[in-house]
UniProtKB/Swiss-Prot annotation:
EC code: 1.14.11.13
Up-regulation conditions: By gibberellin A3 (GA3). Not regulated by auxin.
Keyword Endoplasmic reticulum annotated: no
Protein name, as recorded: Gibberellin 2-beta-dioxygenase 1
Annotated function: Catalyzes the 2-beta-hydroxylation of several biologically active gibberellins, leading to the homeostatic regulation of their endogenous level. Catabolism of gibberellins (GAs) plays a central role in plant development. Converts GA9/GA20 to GA51/GA29 and GA4/GA1 to GA34/GA8.
Molecular function GO terms recorded: gibberellin 2-beta-dioxygenase activity; metal ion binding
Binding site for 2-oxoglutarate: R264
Cofactor binding notes: Binds 1 Fe(2+) ion per subunit.
Tissue expression: Preferentially expressed in flowers, siliques, and upper stems. Not expressed in the apex.
Cofactor: Fe(2+)
Disulfide bonds: none
Enzyme class at the top of the EC tree: oxidoreductase
Length: 329
């Protein structure tokens, strides 16, 4: 099923707006904080992740999605496994197929790997090596963010996603060419590959091939297209990090539009805390309790709330702190 979206005005200056963070720059901590405050989104270069490693995983991913649907559905499941079109259980659909896996190698259960591939060992190794490398990059980014915020110790954020019980996941998405996405023959409308949403975790890390489609939502409500760059990684601030910074960082709303000519393949690492981790504004970032914008909740509570919502819902709204003024209204 194709989901249509009304055409939107894309600012001409949009391409130059996206912050680019050079991880080799010792002062990048300040640029990271500003990017999280202004956009909740940034591009990372000089990240240290092997290009060969990424290429191998992309090759294996393309091989998997090239299999007959009857074979891919043998590893279908919920929440982990193969899925096609249907996103979640609340009516959201898109022009996408995906493979969702547990990304925590230390949990004991390990990622869900398809056993039907021609070379499952190669795919398994690529997934493990990629996840390990991206996790390390994510820790580095979070620790630089902590430095930029002046928080001690510097592993305040990174330790939440490095715990052996972390609830992190890896998602491989494939957006096939969509003939309906040709706006000249489709009334000027876009076809939605993956509907607009925010990521609930602390932070997410995206890498794609060179096919466009990703868009982020600006504060004025407009959407800007993100030029693809297969050599770089893109980071999204998640809902949990928005809460921990008491709204100083913004969880970016984003979506993917289908392409009429080329396939888009993306890999997203979602860095989540353990299920029992309590999420609340960091006390070092607020002067007093009255400034808190959100109630405390566990990651498990928030995760469950996302399972009961639509993609486009403002899922943080129910956790916003009820002030005396709110109660009087």
């Amino acid at each position: 099923m194709a989901v249509l979206s009304k055409p939107v005005a894309i600012p001409k200056s949009g391409f130059s707006l996206i912050p680019v963070i050079d991880m080799s720059d010792p002062e990048s901590k300040h640029a990271l904080v500003k990017a999280c405050e202004d956009f909740g989104f940034f591009k990372v270069i000089n990240h240290g992740v092997s290009a060969e490693l990424v290429s191998v995983l992309e090759h294996e991913t393309v091989d998997f999605f090239s299999l007959p649907k009857s074979e891919k559905t043998q590893v279908a499941g919920y929440p982990f496994g193969y899925g096609n079109s249907k996103i979640g259980r609340n009516g959201d659909v898109g022009w996408v197929e995906y493979l969702l896996m547990n990304a925590n190698h230390d949990s004991g259960s390990g990622p869900l790997f398809p056993s039907l591939l021609k070379s499952p060992g190669t795919f398994r190794n690529a997934l493990e090596e990629y996840t390990t490398s991206v996790r390390k990059m994510t820790f580095d980014v979070l620790e630089k963010i902590t430095d930029g915020l002046g928080i001690k110790p510097r592993n305040t954020l990174s330790k939440l996603v490095s715990d052996q019980n972390t609830d992190s996941i890896l998602r491989l998405n494939h957006y096939p060419p969509c003939p309906l996405s040709n706006k000249k023959t489709n009334g000027g409308k876009n076809v939605i590959g993956f509907g607009e949403h925010t990521d609930p975790q602390i932070i997410s890390v995206l890498r794609s091939n060179n096919t466009s489609g990703l868009q982020i939502n600006l504060n004025d409500g407009s959407w800007i297209s993100v030029p693809p760059d297969h050599t770089s990684f893109f980071f999204n601030v998640g809902d949990s990090l928005q809460v921990m910074t008491n709204g100083r960082f913004k969880s970016v709303r984003h979506r993917v539009l289908a392409n009429c000519k080329k396939s888009r393949v993306s890999m997203i690492y979602f860095a989540g805390p353990s299920l029992t981790q309590r999420i609340a504004p960091l006390t070092c970032l607020i002067d007093n309790e009255d400034e808190r914008l959100y109630e405390e909740f566990t990651w498990s509570e928030y995760k469950n709330s996302t399972y009961n919502s639509r993609l486009s819902d403002n899922r943080l709204q129910q956790f916003e702190r009820k002030t005396i003024k709110n109660l009087l209204n």
